[in-house]
Amino acid sequence: VTDGVYDYDGYYSTNPFAVGRSESVDSKSPTSDSVKQTLYSQLLVKYTENSNEVELSSFKDAALNNQITVKDIRNGIRVEYTLGREEVTYLVPRRIRYDKYLNILYQIAQNSAKKKDKRSFAAFYSLYAINADQLDYELDRDSMTADVLDFFYTTREEGKTLHPGKGSEFGVQWGLIPAYYERINSESNKTISERIRDYPFVQQFAFMVCDSTIQASDLKRLEQMVKLNTDYSNEQMTIDHAETEYSASDKIPALFKMAIEYTINEYGLQIRLNAGNVRFDSSNYKLSNISFLPYAGAADTNNEGFILSPDGSGTIIRLEDIKGQQFTTTSSMYGQDYAYHTVSGANKEVMRYPGFGVVETITKKEEYEDTEIYVDENGEEQTETVIKTRDIKSSHGYFGLITEGATLSKLTVVNGGSLHMFASVYTSFNPRPKDSYVLNGGISVGNDSMWTVESKRKYTGDYKLQIFILDNDHSNHIGMATVYRNYLADEGVITKLDQSGSDDIPLYLQTLGALETSKTFLGVPYDTVVPLTSFVRVKEILEMFKNNEINNVKVILQGITNGGLISYVPTDFTIEKCLEEGHDDVKGMTFKELIEYADANNYQLFPDFDFSLALRDELFDGFNAKDDLSKTINDENAIMREYDPVWQAFIKNGCGIISANAMNKLYDGVYAGYKDYNVGGISVQSLGNMLSSDFNEDDPLNREDSRKLIVKLLAKIKEQNGNVLISGGNAYALPYATDIINMPIDDSRYKYSKASVPFLGIVLHSYKEYAGEPINLAGNYSYTLLKTIESGASPYYTVAYDNTAELKEYATYSTLAKYY
């Protein structure tokens, strides 16, 4: 590509080009054909049928059946896939006259390259007759091979000589027709009478019945035998079924239709799969997962290179470290969706940006001429030209970005290890969200049963990947970060910071405001609210910084309204009065006076409001938990869960998940009073780090719906407040945030990770103001400080001035215990 961002040649393949010579890295044994079929696939589709999970691959279940169509579209191609079986019926007669059955079996026995096929076919059929005379049909014995003749006609007596000690194989391995005679002659009169009653036509001819419990996989196998070795046709089968009064009741087989579009744009390669065009029989099958280009850009682990995963700040997985080790890791983009009962992920960092990549370095031997000096037999120096070899390394790779549908996507890193020699990173998704929950409370008997329900709200938009192809000079994580940053800047997601102000980086200071506690008066307990950091204390802290020439301070005022740190759902703007009080002989300060002081000294205030979590609800405040909290798939209120290292599991913390449907209403209630103060900034931390569905019956939201509502709200907040601070920094919130705290500056330190890299820091540096976690709350102060510096992040601290001992009363309250 010579226009746009590229001025070089690069390459990217949807599948590894060396699948044919693939082998396990450890044992050097060739990769099996079934694994190769997966490596050759652009799509892997998982679905459930009768609680059993089945996987289809686009190579085995589409390409090998000639069910792929390629069409030209503008700037690219469209590849249409039909995965599964298009025919509803199998070319396997379910009922057929005895003589016709023998003819089919005879052709299979004579023509099949596999000797066991004739026995496998016969094993699924049972004889229905009323006397031995109906079996008087003779095959052409003269044309039979010895093996086929033995299979059909060897009698039990003859078998004693031909197959000594193998009498149990009579009628199975050999002697099929004599066994049929023995069987019909041994049947009782009662059995014969019942047969005539059930099948009156049996008085005219004997017939064979295929096993009614036969599985689709076996039907497909028998059909292959019939198609490859006989002249039997669907027309003949229709006649046979009519003759034996059989009505077909075959279940419609699993069939999935979808298409991938590949187009070239100014950034490289764009890949699109429309979820609305994924078609299948949803009444019989439940879609579990679609893996999208699972081995695109895969790297050979025999070479050097790495995989970049968006785990936290970014993590590098080196091919040299994982060679021969088979593993798979999967994480959801943007973390947990708390509307689901199933929460996974243990204690790990969240993927805040939907980017990933692979780089592979290939080493080749190159011959070259060199001149060497030597001393001859006369002691004189001579020169000669010699041929030498040297290693030439060249790198190639790509950076992939999910530009649409990221909220419903999962990212998987997979390494073949003992199966094959490739490692890759890819996305997967399910446009039809579903969840499972336990049926109890008397509904089930014995052990609780799991019930799986599919959401009524389906995603019908696009899943889009933008592939940036990297050349040798840019095949590293710096190059990936550069193309990502340039893309975000070109799309208007981020803009350069104004460098005309202070040269100092900002210091983020989060102050803890008011806290409800219990006290006693004359032995009588009562509830009260005490200040941890009053407004006048905030001023004193800022004065201290000013006296030490620290002037670029941004203050996050947490817990200043609606009940303080354990706040009620924000529906209006009411300052906690205790924060405006003075101390000792120092006069108090109103919120408006604090704003005036901050403006005069160029300090930025960010009063914090949580529109995602409901800690407490007050009667008649405009918030209705029944209507405004997100619902789970079984119509329960969605509750946040946090990882507990003691239980090593996710524990409910009692905080309700506010539906994105209700967030705008809550913000409007707060802004009605907040706008009068003209603060110039607002903190809405949770809008940048939490994203959940809502499975309510009336207006359900999938995760993408919630994202759109949150983005719309953030745009409104930005327009009305100017400066907006968020936490975490989910990629969709970047256009509307001026400041980000708690941005990941480390990875999850997985076993297979070589190192964390400051990928996000490289992307956002000089485009956004950001900070990591509060340094003074970190488990390892020095490590966190160094990671802050490495990431180019600003320092961030959380402080409280007075009454800090009150925090210990909330030791079991997860949102506050960390501060004490």
Regions found by a protein language model. Name each.
Residues 1-528, 539-548, 552-553:
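Carbohydrate-recognition beta-sandwich/jelly-roll modules
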Residues 3, 7, 66, 70, ...:
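Active-site-proximal substrate-binding groove within the catalytic cores of carbohydrate-active enzymes
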Residues 81-83, 275, 294, 557-559, ...:
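Glycine-rich, histidine-containing beta strand-loop boundary motifs that form or position
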Residues 303, 510-512, 555-560, 725-728, ...:
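A generic structural motif
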Residues 470, 474, 528-531, 700-704, ...:
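Hydrophobic alpha-helical scaffolding
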Residues 501-665, 689-693:
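Aromatic-lined carbohydrate-binding/catalytic grooves of carbohydrate-active enzymes
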Residues 545, 685, 788:
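Hydrophobic, well-ordered secondary-structure elements that form the walls
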Residues 552-554, 604-606, 680-683, 723-725:
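Structural preference for beta-strand elements that scaffold enzyme active sites
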